Curated annotation (Swiss-Prot):
Any one Gene Ontology BP term: actin cortical patch localization
Biased composition (Polar residues): 10-22, 31-49
Annotated GO CC locations: cell cortex; plasma membrane
Name under which the protein is recorded: Protein mesA
Segments crossing the lipid bilayer: none
Spans annotated as Disordered: 1-75, 138-196, 302-325, 581-601
Keyword Calcium: no
PANTHER family the record matches: ARF3-INTERACTING PROTEIN 1
All copies of domain uDENN, residue ranges: 81-321
Length: 791
C-alpha cells in the first residue's frame, strides 16, 4: 500500500494522512562521494526504460484514486450520431439519399449542397468538413439539463454516503473529484450556444458511360461530436465504396454500428494541468502510469484478476493482450472492426478548444511565408493588422485579423475543397493556440456563392471558398488569403480602427520611441524568425503548435498588463491573495515576513520599464481591437471557470516569478526569496503540476529552478534540493528531472552529501507531503534507472 497523496482543500491547506509510510523493498541508498565521479552522465538520469524505480513509485501513487475514462463504456453518448448520403441528380441537382438513423435536419437541400462542392465532378475524390449546430430543441434541452443536474446530485449523494466510514480525507478527496468533473464539463460546454456537430464528408466520382454526363457522383458524411473526426477517413473510404455496390440503408447501418462499437474507454481522463504538461512535452511515456492503471482497472472489471501489477501489458511483448499500453501517450490506439476488417485508429489524448480535424500549421505557415521571403509586398497600414508596419509578416497579419474579429476568406481557385477547409481549420488553431475560443463556431471550412447572404450576416467569419468571384468583391471580406499565390490581401473596404482610451493614454504619455528602423517592439518579427528556423530544422508539428500556444499565452498576459496600466485592473487576470491591484506594486516584496509564499508580483515580466512601454504602445491597437470580440469575452468566462483547476497554488504567482528568474538579473536576496517561496508553496501533486506547466521543455525546463542549488545561502540551496527531489518523484516531474543537465545534478548530490555529513537531515524523504510513492532517495532512483537500462 502506497502513501496517500496530500489533497489540497479549498482553503489551500493540505489534508495529509498520518499513517507511516511503508518500504517498497528497495534498498535505501545515501549519496556517496564516489557516485558522481564513477557513473556516466546518464547515471543520474531517471528517464531510462519504463520499469525504472521512479516509474514504479509514480504508478503506485495513482492507486489512491480511481482513474476515470474520457469515454466511459456506460456513456450514452455515441461516437457517431448520424451518417448522411447525397448524390448529384442530372435534373434536380444535389439531393439527399439517406440520413441514418434519422434526419439530422429538415433542410435536405442545404445539406446536399454542402456535401457536393463546386467542381467536384472534375476530381475522382474530395474531402470536405463543415459544422452543424446540434438543435436539441427547447423541451429536450430542459430534459438534458435536468438529467445532468440529477446526475450531479446523485454523485454528491454517493460521495456523502460513502464518506461516513472513510473520514474527512476521503470526503475531501471525493468532493474534489465531483468539482473537477463539473468544471471539466463546463469547460467542454463552452457556453457559446448549442454544441457543434462536426461533419466529415467524402465525395467520389465514378465514370459510368451508361448514365447522363458519363459519371456518378455520391457523397457520404459522418456526423460526430468529437473534434478528432479525421480518424474516420479510412473507414469512410471503405464504406462509400461499399455503398456504390450496395446503395441501401443496411450499408449505412453496418458503418454506424462499427464506428460506435469502437472502444475508447481505456483512455484516461487528464485534468487541465496534466493536459498542458502532456501537450508541451515530447516524452512518449508521459503519464504512462495512468494508462497502466486504466488497463488494470479494465482487467479487474473483465474478471482478469491474474494480471501482474508490476508488469502490465506492453505493446513490445510477444503475446497480444486484450489491452496494451500506447507507444506514445499523446495518442490512444484503438481499432474499428468494419466487415471483419480491423482498421487501426489513433485518437489524440489531449484535445484543446478550436482544434478540429487533422491539419498542419507548418504547411499553412510555409504557404504564406515563402512568397513574402522571396518578394516582400507592403500592406496598406491598418492599426489592428499591421502591428509591425507595412512589412508585417503575413502570418501575423492573419492572426491579428482573427484576433480582432475581421472577416477572413481563404481562396483556393482550382484547388480541392478539402485543401481550403484544412487551411481554415489551421487558421482557427493558429489564432486560438488552444487557449482562446470563438473561431470554429463562426468558421465555414467550405462554402460557395449560393450562401453568400448567410455568410455576410456572420460577424468575423472565417470561410474557405474555391470560386474566384470572391476575389473581385473586396466588400465581402476584410482579409483575403490566396492559397495558390501564397499572398494575403487587406481589403480597401475594411473599417478603420476607432480611437480608444488606450491609444489616448499612450499618446498623453511621454513618447518612448523604438531605437532604429528595424526595431521590433512587439517581438513578432523575432518570433516568426524562430518559427521559420524551427520548420527549416525539421521540427515537428507538435513543436510548432507549442510555440504558437506560447505566443497566444504571451498575448493574453500582455493584454492583461495593458488593462492594468490603462484601466487600473484587468478582466482577464485574477490576482492572488495579498496582492495589490496597482500595476506599480513592487514585485518581490513579502506581505508577511514569516511566510515566504506571500512574495508579491504578478503578470508578464519585461527586462525593464522602457521595454514594457514600447511593447504596450506597439500592441495597443491590436489589444483594444481584441477587447471588443467574442473570443475576449469567452476568455473572461474561461478565466473565471478554470481559475481553481489551473491554479491550485494562488500564492505566489509561479509563472510571474519563474519569468523573473528567466528574464531579470536578480540579486542573491531576490532570487533566494523566489526559491524559498517555491519550496514552501509547492508540496503536493497539483502544485508540482502547476509548476511544470510554466517550465516546459522548450523553455529550458527546470534549468532556472536548478540554479537555486548554487545560491550562496545554504538554506536556499537545501530548500531547492528538497523541491527538486519532490519533482523527481512526481509522475510527470521525473521526466523533467531526467532532462536536467549533469552540472545541476552534481550540485544536487553535493548538497545532499553535505546535509548527510552535517547530520541535519536524512537525504530520504520522510514527510508524506514530500513524497509520491514508497520512500527512496534520488540516488537510489538514479541507480535503479541505470540497472534498468543495463538489463
Amino acid at each position: 500500500m502506497s502513501i496517500p497523496l496530500p489533497i489540497r482543500t479549498s482553503d489551500g491547506t493540505g489534508n495529509l494522512s498520518s499513517s507511516p509510510p511503508k518500504s517498497n523493498g528497495l534498498p535505501r541508498l545515501s549519496p556517496s562521494p564516489s557516485f558522481v565521479q564513477k557513473h556516466s552522465p546518464r547515471s543520474s538520469d531517471t528517464s531510462g526504460l519504463r520499469r525504472s524505480a521512479s516509474h514504479h513509485n509514480a504508478r503506485q501513487t495513482f492507486k489512491q484514486r480511481r482513474c476515470k475514462s474520457q469515454y466511459p463504456r456506460d456513456s450514452p453518448e455515441r461516437h457517431v450520431e448520424f451518417i448522411l448520403v447525397a448524390s448529384f441528380h442530372i435534373d434536380r441537382g444535389p439531393i439527399m439519399e439517406h440520413q441514418y438513423p434519422g434526419p439530422i435536419s429538415s433542410d435536405e437541400g442545404m445539406l446536399a449542397e454542402l456535401m457536393l462542392p463546386d467542381q467536384t465532378h472534375v476530381r475522382s475524390q474530395d474531402w470536405t468538413i463543415f459544422f452543424l449546430p446540434l438543435d436539441t430543441g427547447g423541451e429536450g434541452e430542459e430534459d438534458d439539463l435536468a438529467g445532468e443536474n440529477n446526475k450531479r446530485k446523485g454523485k454528491r449523494n454517493r460521495v456523502r454516503s460513502s464518506s461516513g466510514d472513510e473520514g474527512t480525507s476521503a470526503d475531501t478527496n471525493n468532493e474534489s473529484e465531483v468539482t473537477e468533473e463539473e468544471e471539466s464539463s463546463d469547460e467542454e460546454d463552452g457556453g457559446e450556444g448549442p454544441p457543434l456537430m462536426y461533419v466529415l464528408n467524402l465525395v467520389n466520382t465514378k465514370q459510368d458511360n451508361t448514365v447522363k454526363r458519363g459519371a456518378v457522383v455520391k457523397a457520404m458524411a459522418i456526423c460526430t461530436r468529437h473534434s478528432f473526426l479525421h480518424i474516420y477517413k479510412p473507414i469512410l473510404l471503405l464504406a462509400l465504396e461499399d455503398y456504390f455496390k450496395n446503395p441501401y440503408p443496411e450499408t449505412l447501418e453496418t458503418l454506424y454500428n462499427a464506428v460506435n462499437a469502437m472502444d475508447l474507454s481505456p483512455m484516461p481522463k487528464l485534468n487541465l494541468l496534466e493536459r498542458q504538461i502532456l501537450q508541451a512535452t515530447n516524452s512518449k511515456d508521459m503519464f504512462i502510469e495512468k494508462f497502466e492503471q486504466m488497463v488494470q482497472q479494465r482487467a479487474i472489471e473483465d474478471g482478469e484478476n491474474d494480471i501482474d501489477e508490476d508488469n502490465p501489458p506492453s505493446p513490445r511483448r510477444g503475446t497480444a493482450p486484450r489491452y496494451t499500453l500506447p507507444r506514445d501517450t499523446h495518442e490512444f490506439e484503438s481499432k474499428i472492426i468494419y466487415n471483419d476488417i480491423p482498421i487501426p485508429v489513433k485518437v489524440p489524448t489531449v484535445i484543446w478548444p478550436e482544434i478540429v480535424g487533422d491539419f498542419s500549421l507548418v504547411k499553412l505557415i510555409q504557404i504564406f511565408s515563402a512568397p513574402h521571403a522571396a518578394s516582400p509586398q507592403p500592406f496598406p497600414l491598418h492599426p489592428h493588422l499591421t502591428t509591425s508596419g507595412p512589412l508585417t509578416h503575413p502570418i501575423i497579419v492573419l492572426v491579428n485579423a482573427m484576433l480582432t474579429q475581421k472577416r477572413v476568406v481563404f481562396l483556393g481557385h482550382n484547388r480541392p475543397s478539402g485543401e481550403v477547409a484544412e487551411a481554415v481549420l489551421a487558421a482557427c488553431a493558429l489564432a486560438s493556440g488552444g487557449i482562446l475560443r470563438g473561431f470554429t463556431r463562426h468558421a465555414f471550412p467550405y462554402t460557395d456563392l449560393t450562401k453568400i447572404d448567410d455568410l455576410l450576416r456572420v460577424p468575423g467569419f472565417i470561410a474557405g471558398v474555391t470560386n474566384p468571384t470572391f476575389a473581385n468583391h473586396p466588400e465581402w471580406w476584410d482579409v483575403l488569403c490566396d492559397l495558390p499565390t501564397g499572398r494575403i490581401k487587406i481589403s480597401n473596404h475594411i473599417e478603420p480602427a476607432p480611437v480608444t482610451d488606450g491609444q489616448l493614454y499612450f499618446q498623453q504619455q511621454s513618447p518612448v520611441s523604438a531605437s532604429g528602423p528595424n526595431a521590433d517592439p512587439t517581438g513578432d518579427n523575432l518570433f516568426m524568425e524562430d518559427v521559420l528556423r524551427s520548420i527549416a530544422n525539421r521540427y515537428g508539428e507538435n513543436a510548432i503548435r507549442a510555440k504558437w500556444r506560447a505566443y497566444i499565452t504571451k498575448f493574453t498576459r500582455v493584454a492583461a498588463a495593458f488593462e492594468e496600466t490603462v484601466y487600473g485592473a484587468s478582466n482577464i487576470y485574477i490576482i492572488g491573495p495579498n496582492e495589490e491591484l496597482s500595476p506599480d506594486s513592487p514585485s518581490g516584496l513579502q506581505s508577511d515576513p514569516g511566510d515566504p509564499t506571500t512574495i508579491r508580483g504578478h503578470g508578464y515580466v519585461w527586462p525593464d520599464e522602457a521595454s514594457k512601454q514600447r511593447e504596450l504602445m506597439a500592441s495597443v491597437s491590436r489589444i483594444e481591437g481584441w477587447r471588443t470580440t467574442r473570443s475576449y469575452y469567452s476568455f473572461i468566462q474561461d478565466i473565471a471557470a478554470m481559475y481553481w483547476p489551473s491554479r491550485p497554488i494562488q500564492k505566489p504567482d509561479l509563472h510571474h516569478h519563474h519569468d523573473r528568474l528567466r528574464t531579470l538579473k536578480l540579486s542573491a536576496y531576490e532570487a533566494g526569496a523566489i526559491y524559498l517561496a517555491f519550496a514552501h508553496a509547492i508540496k503536493d501533486y497539483a502544485g508540482i503540476c502547476q509548476l511544470l506547466t510554466v517550465t516546459p521543455e522548450s523553455q529550458a525546463g527546470l534549468f532556472y529552478l536548478s540554479m537555486g542549488l548554487l545560491h550562496p545561502d545554504r538554506n536556499v540551496r537545501e530548500a531547492t534540493a528538497d523541491l527538486l527531489e519532490r519533482i523527481a518523484l512526481h509522475p510527470a516531474g521525473r521526466h523533467f528531472w531526467a532532462q536536467l543537465n549533469r552540472f545541476a545534478k552534481t550540485a544536487y548530490f553535493r548538497i545532499k552529501r553535505e546535509k548527510e555529513a552535517a547530520g541535519n537531515s536524512s537525504p530520504i524523504v520522510k514527510s508524506p507531503s514530500d513524497s509520491f510513492g514508497p520512500q527512496q532517495s534520488l540516488v537510489g532512483v538514479a541507480i535503479s534507472g541505470v540497472h534498468s537500462q543495463g538489463s
